[in-house]
């Protein structure tokens, strides 16, 4: 799959994505993270989120060893399956973040096992913040990417979280556009504008945002 990513994103694309992630973190996602939090980025990929978030301790978890090349200063990169992050103790993480990860899992059983593992490592009332394509919005476009295997709607994912021992705190069915290759937003300035006006989300959003808390 690493060859797919090399074909999909040029160096210019990666630079643009990094800048847009900086805006997304600083102008929206930071609100969920206190400065003393222990944060784990699940399926961290190029580490755009975890490198920029301000918190006390940072973990980047990915099955791809290449994650170590992208983890910035102060980020501990862990090579691990999402269903068994054995190096992380029980009840030790304040917040787990995951973006564009669950749709790559092979089946729903693996998704549920992953959520159970997330619950294990979270502190009591710790949170998971999830961004993922919403099949209710993106529909057939979901399959435009060869490595997408597991579609979820916001309703379906909330149900999976509930049965895994989480309480839903926030659901935005339409949050971000489906891909950075879409027409909007196409720059850091446009993204800042977009994040300030939820009406834009309803027009262009095809990815969901869900925040849930460990019960």
Kindly give the residue locations of the regions a language model identified.
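Conserved N-terminal segment of class I S-adenosyl-L-methionine
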Residues: 1-89, 95-99, 115
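Conserved acidic functional residues
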Residues: 90, 103, 145
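S-adenosyl-L-methionine-dependent methyltransferase catalytic module, highlighting the catalytic core
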Residues: 15, 97, 106-121, 127-215
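Short glycine-centered segments of the SAM/dcSAM-binding site in methyltransferase folds
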Residues: 38, 126-127
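Short acidic capping loops at alpha-helix termini that bridge into adjacent secondary structure
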Residues: 91-92, 125
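Active-site micro-motifs of SAM-dependent methyltransferase domains
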Residues: 84, 103, 137
């Amino acid at each position: 799959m690493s060859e797919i990513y090399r074909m999909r994103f040029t160096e210019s694309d990666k630079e643009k994505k990094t800048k847009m992630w900086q805006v997304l973190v600083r102008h929206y996602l930071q609100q969920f993270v206190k400065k003393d939090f222990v944060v784990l980025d699940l399926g961290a990929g190029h580490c755009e989120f975890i490198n920029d978030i301000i918190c006390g301790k940072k973990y980047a978890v990915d099955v791809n060893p290449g994650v170590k090349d992208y983890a910035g200063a102060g980020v501990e990169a862990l090579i691990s399956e999402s269903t068994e992050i054995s190096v992380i103790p029980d009840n030790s993480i304040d917040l787990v973040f995951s973006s564009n990860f669950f749709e790559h899992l092979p089946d729903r059983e693996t998704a549920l096992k992953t959520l159970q593992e997330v619950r294990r490592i979270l502190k009591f009332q710790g949170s998971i913040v999830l961004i993922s394509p919403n099949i209710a919005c993106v529909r057939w476009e979901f399959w435009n990417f060869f490595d997408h295997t597991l579609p979820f709607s916001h309703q379906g994912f909330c149900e999976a979280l509930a049965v895994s021992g989480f309480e839903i705190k926030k659901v935005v069915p339409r949050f971000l556009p489906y891909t950075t290759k879409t027409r909007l937003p196409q720059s850091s300035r446009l993204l800042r504008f977009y994040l300030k006006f939820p009406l834009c989300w309803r027009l262009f959003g095809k990815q969901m945002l869900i925040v849930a808390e460990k019960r």
